[in-house]
UniProtKB/Swiss-Prot annotation:
This is Uncharacterized protein RC0076. It comes from the Bacteria. Residues 1-21 form the signal peptide. It comes from Rickettsia conorii (strain ATCC VR-613 / Malish 7). SUPFAM superfamilies: beta-carbonic anhydrase, cab. Gene3D superfamilies: Carbonic anhydrase. One of its GO terms (molecular function) is carbonate dehydratase activity. Keywords: Signal.
Length: 186
């Protein structure tokens, strides 16, 4: 009986998605899309030096790409996006997010020979508000301190599990200003 419920629920979910797509002309009518290849030379590459771990927030997609270019990493990084970026690695509610990050690092070391991790958190992050609480973020100083503590904890976890990798941590404002968060000496 349980199997039947799952099948029915799965059918309803798929039907709902199809109904949404049918009502969304921009997506529903696109059977095949040709996307212009901007970097033909990338087809032959099989390495990327860096894994960027950033938040899923749509507000900073372009700024994130610009940062990676300014860091000299354009066309030289893989990317994982999860709510909260570094918070995804250490939060107690969604522990599988941390496992996802660790598994991704493991496979990308083999696939793309990554040598470093860049964590990119951002200010006014909804995941931070939900998972650590608004009261810990209600001033710029508190917000910076909360991100710095979590970024440094994430750095420690990565260094312990993947000691051969360099880890860099950054905090981006919604205005595009990016601060590097340095390791707190023990």
């Amino acid at each position: 009986m349980i199997h039947v419920k799952y099948i029915i629920l799965g059918f309803i979910m798929v039907s709902s998605l199809n109904l949404y797509a049918a009502n969304n002309d921009i997506i529903a009518n696109k059977k095949v899309v040709k996307v212009e290849v901007s970097n033909e030379h990338l087809k032959t590459l099989n390495e990327a030096s860096t894994l960027l771990i950033s938040c899923v927030d749509f507000r900073l997609i372009d700024e994130t790409d610009k940062l990676m270019k300014q860091l000299g990493l354009e066309d030289n990084f893989d990317k994982v996006s999860l709510p909260g970026a570094s918070l995804a690695l250490i939060n107690d509610k969604y522990t599988y997010w941390g496992k996802t990050i660790e598994d991704t690092i493991e496979i990308l070391q083999e696939l793309h020979n990554i040598k470093q991790i860049v964590f990119l958190d951002h200010r006014e992050c909804g995941a931070y508000k939900i998972l650590i609480g608004q009261e810990q973020l209600n001033t710029k100083e508190k917000e910076t301190a909360a991100h710095a503590a979590i970024l440094n904890k994430a750095r420690d976890i990565i260094k312990e599990k993947f000691p051969q990798l360099k880890v860099y941590t950054f905090l981006m404002g919604l205005d595009g200003v990016v601060e590097q968060i340095y390791e707190i000496p023990s």
